[in-house]
Curated annotation (Swiss-Prot):
Keywords linked to the UniProt accession: Golgi apparatus, Membrane, Sugar transport, Transmembrane, Transmembrane helix, Transport
Protein name: UDP-galactose transporter
GO terms classed as biological process: UDP-galactose transmembrane import into Golgi lumen; UDP-galactose transmembrane transport
Family: Belongs to the nucleotide-sugar transporter family. SLC35A subfamily.
Gene: gms1
Topology term for the membrane: Multi-pass membrane protein
Residues passing through the membrane, by range: 147-167, 184-204, 215-235, 254-274, 279-299, 302-322
Amino acid sequence: MAVKGDDVKWKGIPMKYIALVLLTVQNSALILTLNYSRIMPGYDDKRYFTSTAVLLNELIKLVVCFSVGYHQFRKNVGKEAKLRAFLPQIFGGDSWKLAIPAFLYTCQNNLQYVAAGNLTAASFQVTYQLKILTTAIFSILLLHRRLGPMKWFSLFLLTGGIAIVQLQNLNSDDQMSAGPMNPVTGFSAVLVACLISGLAGVYFEKVLKDTNPSLWVRNVQLSFFSLFPCLFTILMKDYHNIAENGFFFGYNSIVWLAILLQAGGGIIVALCVAFADNIMKNFSTSISIIISSLASVYLMDFKISLTFLIGVMLVIAATFLYTKPESKPSPSRGTYIPMTTQDAAAKDVDHKH
């Protein structure tokens, strides 16, 4: 059954708003630390292997989600419940469904590193906002969700606002890179990552809202199945370098912070798609880019211009338009009877019929 974000509250605050705020803060910190970990002075010849970072990210999520899921299981069944009674919930039933988004998310994470290594930060962030539109398209195709003209307009408005904000960075970005840049490779990687992001996010949302296993069990399954493509990437891409230099080559406190933030983001994203929806998650992520730009004023001598202010206003306007409640359909148009629990979930989220 679908869980409405307004029904679940923490100290009177709907969980969907708490999750979205957490995601915004997490993304803001992640963008700054991840970028700095790749351009940190003094580490030009000691860059960490990104495939190892992706694997550690999934391992951390696996441990955290398994611990919380097992704790909830014992709370519901009884503290005398054994671990072997919990394992069938993870590896039984329809757990195989999570192998699909697990593979997609692993590809997306690795493509992000490829894009970031071949594009300036601004170019990468601008192009990556296409995931908002791909998410909306896949929501329509897979969830049969309807978006009104105003919401479509807000999606394009948001994309334009983010583009304006980030384009001004093209003249101020430090041209630091771990190696030679190839714009064609970078743009190709980010475009494919946007398609994968939209498909994986919506598919995961459908699995979460259309089945019975808890959020934490689903995250355990997702992280577990992600380990296989992560290990395959390490073997195919960085095995010889890791064998020569070690698994943790180039690691420092900033790298670990970036990994922890990315792992925490995966958990927060799951909360967002459980209590809100995937497009709202993308709005939160986009707003966090603006916050990161503001933080760059103090950290990287970023200068606010009129262009930046115009972009901020467009993003705020787009967010207002998307979250504005739509008028309910007239009773004379008939009553929609959902045929599946997913139809009911879509109706709960978007108030469609």
